[in-house]
Amino acid sequence: MNHYIRTIGSMLILVYSMLAAFLFIDKVFVNIIYFQGMFYTQIFGIPVFLFLNLIIILLCIIVGSVLAYKINQQNDWIKTQIERSMEGETVGINDQNIEIYSETLDLYHTLVPLNQELHKLRLKTQNLTNENYNINDVKVKKIIEDERQRLARELHDSVSQQLFAASMMLSAIKETKLEPPLDQQIPILEKMVQDSQLEMRALLLHLRPLGLKDKSLGEGIKDLVIDLQKKVPMKVVHEIQDFKVPKGIEDHLFRITQEAISNTLRHSNGTKVTVELFNKDDYLLLRIQDNGKGFNVDEKLEQSYGLKNMRERALEIGATFHIVSLPDSGTRIEVKAPLNKEDSYDD
C-alpha cells in the first residue's frame, strides 16, 4: 500500500510544482497570451488556476476512496483468515480474488505460523483429552475391581462362613434321632443351605475371578476346574489340548470360561459341566457345556449381563460366540477364535 501513497504524493508535488512554474513564467512573460489565458481565463465562472486545483483535489478524493475500499477489503480478508484460524481451519491465500498489498502479505505470513501453532495446540488438547479419558477409564475400572474384591472378601468372611457353619450344624442334627416333622424338614433345610453355598461360590467366582498370571490358557482352565472340583457338588470335567494361544486373547477366553461356569453353577440346576479347548489349525474352539435345565436363548441373551459380557469379550478378540440351549437338555456355549500361526508360536 505504501507505493500507492507515495504515487499520490509525488503526483501532487509534480502538479503544484508545475503550477508554481506557470505562475512564475506568467509574472515574467506577461505578454505571452497562453499563460495569460491560463491564469485569467475562467471556466464556469471559476479561474483556471482554482479550477485545476479543484480537479486535483477531486482526483485525490477518488483515488483515496479507491484505496480505502481496497484497504477495507484487506482488513476484511485478514479478519476472515483470523476467524477461520480460531475455528481450527487452515488459512490459505488461494481462496480470494483481491489484490494483496505487501503489508497484508507480511501480516498473512505472520498469521500462517500462528495458525499452524494453534492447530498443533488443538491436536495436543485432543490428545490430552483422550489421555485423560483413558486414565479416567482405567481409574473407574480399578475402582470397580477394588469394590468387587471388597464385596467378595466380605461375602467370603461373613455369609460364606455362616453358611458353612449352618451346614455343619444341620449335618450334626441329622445324626440324631428326629421326630416328625423335623425328620423331613431338616433335609430340606440342608438342601437349601447347600444350594446357597453353591450360589455363593458362583458369586465369588464372578466377583473375584482368578487371573492367568504366568500360566497358559490351558493351565489356567485346568487349575480352575481342579479348584471347583473341591468346592462344588457339581461334577466339573475338562478336556484341554496343549497348544500355544496368542497372549492377546488368552485373558478374554479365560474370563469367558469363568463367566460361563459361574452362570452354570448358579442357574443350570445340572449335575455336570464340561470345559473343552481344542486347536482346529486355523482357529481354536472353546466349549462349555452342562446337562442342566436349559433356557430360551432369545429371551435370556438380551437380559443376562453375564451372557452379554461373554459375547462382548468374544467380539473384542474377533471371535464368534454361539449359544445352544434346549429345555431339559442343557446348554452349550462355543467360542471360535481365529489363530495366527506366527503369533501363536512367538515367545
UniProtKB/Swiss-Prot annotation:
Catalytic activities: ATP + protein L-histidine = ADP + protein N-phospho-L-histidine
InterPro entries in alphabetical order: HATPase_C_sf, LiaS/VraS, Sensor_HK_TwoCompSys, Sig_transdc_His_kin_sub3_dim/P
Residues bearing PTM Phosphohistidine: 156
Gene Ontology cellular-component annotations: plasma membrane
Membrane-traversing stretches: 13-33, 43-63
Family annotation (Gene3D superfamilies): 1.20.5.1930, Histidine kinase-like ATPase, C-terminal domain
Enzyme class: transferase
Assigned EC number: 2.7.13.3
One of the GO BP terms on file: response to antibiotic
SUPFAM superfamilies: ATPase domain of HSP90 chaperone/DNA topoisomerase II/histidine kinase
Membrane topology according to the record: Multi-pass membrane protein
Induction section of the entry: Induced by antibiotics (teicoplanin, ceftizoxime, imipenem, bacitracin, D-cycloserine and vancomycin).
Protein role: Member of the two-component regulatory system PprA/PprB involved in biofilm formation by controlling the expression of many related genes including type IVb pili major subunit flp pilin, adhesin bapA or cupE fimbriae. Also modulates quorum-sensing signal production acting on both negative and positive modulators. Functions as a heme sensor histidine kinase which is autophosphorylated at a histidine residue and transfers its phosphate group to PprB.
Protein's name according to its UniProt entry: Sensor protein VraS
Species this chain originates from: Staphylococcus aureus (strain N315)
